[in-house]
């Protein structure tokens, strides 16, 4: 995974957290940077906030003891909101203001525990206070006691949830205690005594609450956040474990489905304080309608509810090898439907593809979500037809930007490995013998008025159920034997995808080089190589294409191309951006069909020995090249890169230097008989024939396709 992709994943997690979680995570990451990095970040932040007048006003209020003292006359809801916005702005060393905060915090926490309100907001306040450099060791020790009170109160209120939550708190504290022993020397030395106070305090108050309610420390950790955030070298690990519960209304942060892990992080992104005040009693979990957005396990992202405890033995197809469901959580998240991940986690791929609105209605899915899910599944069913359409567009010379963008989007959708129909009867005979959890979409879960429609849908979905045989990595799909000829069976999405990738490779090899398309294509192949739906044979073929495109890219005469004014005018972006995907502007600009005459063939694609097959009359002599390769003629349509540098080292290759080595899949025809065979009248055109380059491209295209379809075990091409 490239750095750009890693940053994107991290940004996705970050957006799913609330402001407090974001602050804790950033603080834990900053502990790992050097002094120079920390100072640079400080300068950047100070520069960006210099003109923020509103922040300056809040900061003055946050450090004014008189203003803070007046908050005691306000309602508890308003005080909580004020504390959340002002406490982080308290300056270290302002003892008077800190004393006022320490007077308010116990009152707010006591009110929250007594009335079982604002539990989440109270946890956030505790988080800020426990990691704030302005609070002393004694302050943190006193505040840490409230965390246990919050836990006890919530455990009593929520009944069966106390086991998982108390375990998770103990786990976070114990894990932090041991982690701290080895992390003091890894903080790069720029933390001061204020920060070290956090760590000392955390160790002290952890000892007071080290006893586990169940008599042991659980051995699992959060599955929704990166490991580094749960094993940080500061007290933020404890804060995360303390915050990680009682939030059944928040969205799931993780791209993976909720698991039986009580130590899950909060998931509500960019909460406003109005939202914090408005939530109140709604945070209580519901025993009904588990799929509604207000109470679903998936939407909360929390593993501490009784729903997950009841499903400890339930199947989770997201984790089953060859199920085709591993990408469903990410797919649902892209559709903003990830709150229903728990529903899909107990379906097979075939059951998901056969879903109807009636079945979803029986599971209490809202009307808008039902409609969106059904439409999205219908789009999944149309993927193979879309691939066929893309294949035709590529063959006809269409722009590669749009197909590559479509392929990038498609590879992120759920794709299951194709199983031939011959294995389906055996799989079906074995299926009743295997123990299986009842499906959520079974007849018993459907409403009476929907059973007939579901039965009809199931009948129509029977052919697609042939893929239930599981992943067969060594099975050969039809496209591997005859890439460009044999039709693929219905449902062979990986095979169809591979075929389109072959067509794209052909176009990249024979068309004018486009670094953006090449980079996008290589990234796409990397995703295919780690995808479970593709067979080993398909992956070998994809790897071969990747190597060829990489070789083509490495042999790219960059200096020569950068010296061509016409090429620079057509490409507004320079080289060195090979890791970038097509941008919105570039994709929008390439919507029209590509004119083959505008994309000439560079010298590396066809060696000079093969060019000789066309006869000397089809090309310009060296003297003619010297007189015709002028910018004016290039702008008039003769922009063939062969004529870009007359007389130079990158000019049209001679017979003594071939830019492409000979391979066994495409022999070089140098005998007189073969030369006569290729010297047909249609190729013996005058030099002034305007479509000579178009004919050359067609010839190279056919030669490359012949090489790509060389055979089952012969993965080499030109």
UniProtKB/Swiss-Prot annotation:
Gene3D superfamilies: Smaug, PHAT domain (1.25.40.170), Transcription Factor, Ets-1 (1.10.150.50)
Subcellular location: Cytoplasm; Cell projection, Dendrite; Synapse, Synaptosome
Example GO BP: nuclear-transcribed mRNA poly(A) tail shortening
Main location: cytoplasm
GO CC terms in record: cell junction; cytosol; dendrite; fibrillar center; P-body; synapse
UniProt keyword list: Cell projection, Cytoplasm, Methylation, Phosphoprotein, Repressor, Synapse, Synaptosome, Translation regulation
N-terminal signal peptide: none
Domain SAM: residue ranges: 323-391
Record PTM Omega-N-methylarginine, positions in chain: 573
Disordered, as annotated region: 278-323, 416-474, 572-601
Family: Belongs to the SMAUG family.
Function according to Swiss-Prot or TrEMBL: Acts as a translational repressor of SRE-containing messengers.
Protein name, per record: Protein Smaug homolog 1
Organism: Homo sapiens (Human)
